[in-house]
Amino acid sequence: MATQEIIDSALPYLTKWYTVITLAALVFLISSNIKNYVKAKKLKCRDPPYFKGAGWTGISPLIEIIKVKGNGRLARFWPIKTFDDYPNHTFYMSIIGALKIVLTVIQENIKAVLATQFTDFSLGTRHAHFYPLLGDGIFTLDGEGWKHSRAMLRPQFARDQIGHVKALEPHIQILAKQIKLNKGKTFDIQELFFRFTVDTATEFLFGESVHSLYDEKLGIPTPNEIPGRDNFATAFNTSQHYLATRTYSQTFYFLTNPKEFRDCNAKVHYLAKYFVNKALNFTPEEIEEKSKSGYVFLYELVKQTRDPKVLQDQLLNIMVAGRDTTAGLLSFAMFELARHPEIWSKLREEIEVNFGVGEESRVEEITFESLKRCEYLKAILNETLRMYPSVPVNSRTATRDTTLPRGGGPNGTDPIFIPKGSTVAYIVYKTHRLEEYYGKDADDFRPERWFEPSTKKLGWAYVPFNGGPRICLGQQFALTEASYVITRLVQMFETVSSPPDVEYPPPKCIHLTMSHDDGVFVKM
């Protein structure tokens, strides 16, 4: 066939709009990759190894992640040991050659993303992922919006606010009643912890608890009737499930927006609006009077702004951060304590010395300050957060062309070029289990390691609460609440044990935070 004939036969297809768009995209993609290659060479950067399971499109791992995410089995699917197959535990994948995703676990890169090169990265599409539930809050905003949110919220986590552990005691009493209903039986304590933390969080944030721990089994009437109370906890959980799926979908988040998600968001917003409107109807004098009986997050925010949307969004942002993370920490701590009676006994000795146990418990002596004396308790919580960080996977998006210090090249020692728009995912779960940071027993639950000199030099190899400018404002709040709860349980219950056939390592479920996939079954 003559050249002219070939051109004539191809011309109708070449002029079609979809062909033109495809060719233009291909030209743009090739030119962008060439430019990035030249920039990387100038900066003496080299790519890390390409993820073997990604294929040339890079889409198959994302599809598989979304699929198993729907079954709540993401942590079981993602092979954490995969990082050991690559130099410096770093590799990358590319979505159709356009979107670069670097996955890393080493502390030098985590430090760069979160601190030393903080301004080079943003939350990327997180705002779009989370907006339907959380709106514009501290965990969804970047830039000036984030700075304003942080300045508004920082005073709310001052020592005077987080130190009031006495507000937890009424909820502890109900939790203990629920546990005692299962005396001599194996039961799921994680389910109780999640109900407990939604009760304490709503009281701290809204001024009234939703009392989800109250049920017909206790035979105790709910102290107050709140519109939407019964649906709140379930709706909140379901909404977070969909938020996580949207997050793992990256730029395809908009495909996850079913009616159930929208309905659950509406139920959560209904309750939040109820409390916000109630607070806004109080006079400044009434707010001051109510604040005298105990600290309430919402009442303090009302003194700074009377914008109902700002109040609702910030409250729900803090709710997401404060409720599930603490419940997960408590659940995994009890899971390990039930497996290690020797650790429980040693902890009970420390609690007995400081606060008494059983009928000789001196509950009134448990304060924010006195809990700091319990060094072994602190070590147990540190070890729990090491092995089971609340947010095991996180990511940032490059706002400009930048670099990561290590992970590139065949030996993983070269810097990596990160083009603008690329994603850097850092997997803290794996960081906390690297032998080079924690030794040969990195996969073992051993609180004693926190009394060893090596753990004083961990730096960015231990980041359960993130780090840098966006370090978690509520970390001390969460640790104080967890410390108080465990101390009181140790005082009230002599032993805790787990079934002999309990699965280990435990199956983990990742939504926005990590929890035990099958529940934490113990006997107390």
From Swiss-Prot:
Pfam families: p450. Its cofactor is heme. Keywords: Heme, Iron, Membrane, Metal-binding, Monooxygenase, Oxidoreductase, Transmembrane, Transmembrane helix. Its main location: membrane. The chain crosses the membrane at residues 17-34. Induction: By various alkanes. Its EC number is 1.14.14.-. It is found in: Membrane. GO terms for cellular component: membrane. InterPro entries: Cyt_P450 (IPR001128), Cyt_P450_CS (IPR017972), Cyt_P450_E_CYP52_ascomycetes (IPR002974), Cyt_P450_E_CYP52_fungi (IPR047146), Cyt_P450_E_grp-II (IPR002402), Cyt_P450_sf (IPR036396). It is an enzyme of class 1 (oxidoreductase). Heme binds at residue 472. Belongs to the cytochrome P450 family. This is Cytochrome P450 52A6. It comes from Candida tropicalis (Yeast). The gene is CYP52A6.
